[in-house]
Amino acid sequence: AFAQQGPKYVFYFIGDGMGVNQVNATETYLAAVEGRRGIKPLTFPSFPNVALVNTQSDSHGITDSAAGGTALATGRKTYNNAIGVLPDSITPITSIAVWAKDAGAAVGIATSVSVDHATPACFYAHQKHRKMYAEIGRDLVKSNFDFFAGSDFLKPAPLTSGEADLYTQARNAGFTIANGKE
């Protein structure tokens, strides 16, 4: 009798601003480049598990990356500009990444933007406004996640005198910071 094992790795890819129409347009374009009609399928729509999520914000018909990221990370809606908090702007919402970490999984966040930008921040931070970069950076340091990769912090300077910058805080929390080709 073999016990069923869970997956070894789970990857959660987010195409920021990408919906079904953008995927279809890309597939149509790729076919046209080859001189044919129809579509040339992308790989990811044929993954074994694919989900469509409505990320409309609680405050607007058109969402922003903060509310959309919060919906993707937590399954809950919030207002535009909110990072990981309910519409009351105070109550934190637990993300799927935190659930995974609490269950014993190693968790990493990789992004093409800064690590304290709206979409990646929704997986570890709880702030009332997406531009609270220093506070979001503090949340990153306290996250206990295993890995972050991105294009730096947007506001690494300390918020108050006597406080260390985010690089020092991250190193003190056990993170190794690599710049360039390190």
Describe each model-derived feature in a short phrase:
Residues 2-182:
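N-terminal catalytic scaffold of extracellular/periplasmic and nuclease hydrolases
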